[in-house]
């Protein structure tokens, strides 16, 4: 059935962007790692510089999740063609710091067993994130200003977005938390998670253009998000809030992407 929200997820007769898998060096992690990069229609021929949106997956996902399950390329193609979103580059990272790439992939082309539990929420992803930005800004035609960078993620990726954006308060003017986990795991000793209140004060003191929080009414992280919003409210920090029906599901995360992307780089 045509019409409505589902049209944004379809391959329509509009100009299509390009999706590429790229390997980059992460000196912080001592690894060659893989990212997925969406460039908008016309990137190859325009000569223009573009803003960049870093889009992060949740627990159990990798750099393929937002393309395969999130319909990111279709959503961006359609929003850009409709004039609702600015043409932008979207960079999808792998938040499992022990992995080079999605299971079964390696920089040597060898199949690697995915046995160990990857490092996920202990500071490695956050501390190594500048390596990704350095690669993108060295290899793509991009605007290299805070006002031209956005970061958002779902669940664990929302957690990473929260902590990366407060750790590097001059990096992102647009932050999106989709069904985000909020607090680090008990016993986590990474300096990334220390002095959270002071870091938030610095971040919000620099007045990000958009700090957007979205969650479903029956999401198991709902209460965590209520508590986090109370902290922001108590300190007078400005954010926008979007509440949907339903829980911790891709149906919601796709909706959040369609709401968030049009607000970027305005």
Label every PLM stretch briefly.
Residues 1-266:
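Non-catalytic cap/lid and distal C-terminal segments of serine-dependent acyl enzymes
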């Amino acid at each position: 059935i045509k019409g409505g929200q589902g049209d944004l997820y379809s391959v329509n007769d509009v100009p299509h962007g390009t999706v590429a898998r790229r390997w980059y060096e992460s000196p912080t992690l001592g690894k060659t790692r893989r990212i997925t990069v969406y460039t908008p229609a016309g990137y190859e021929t325009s000569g223009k510089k573009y803003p960049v949106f870093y889009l992060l997956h949740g627990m159990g996902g990798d750099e393929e999740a937002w393309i395969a399950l999130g319909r990111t390329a279709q959503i961006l193609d359609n929003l850009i063609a409709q004039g609702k979103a600015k043409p932008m580059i979207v960079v999808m990272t792998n938040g499992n710091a022990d992995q080079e790439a999605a299971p079964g992939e390696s920089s040597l082309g060898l199949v690697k067993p995915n046995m160990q539990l990857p490092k996920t929420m202990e500071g490695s992803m956050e501390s190594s994130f500048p390596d990704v930005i350095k690669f993108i800004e060295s290899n793509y035609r991009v605007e290299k200003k805070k006002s031209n960078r956005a970061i958002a993620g779902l669940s664990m990726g929302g957690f990473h977005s929260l902590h990366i954006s407060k750790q590097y308060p001059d990096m992102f003017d647009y932050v999106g938390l989709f069904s985000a986990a909020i607090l680090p795991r008990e016993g986590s000793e990474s300096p990334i998670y220390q002095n959270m209140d002071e870091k938030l004060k610095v971040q919000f003191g620099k007045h990000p253009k958009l700090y957007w929080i979205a969650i479903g009414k029956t999401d198991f992280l709902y209460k965590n998000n209520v508590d986090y919003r109370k902290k922001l409210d108590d300190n007078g920090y400005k954010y926008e809030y979007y509440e949907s029906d339903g829980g911790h599901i891709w149906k919601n995360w796709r909706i959040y992407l369609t709401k968030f992307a049009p607000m970027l780089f305005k």
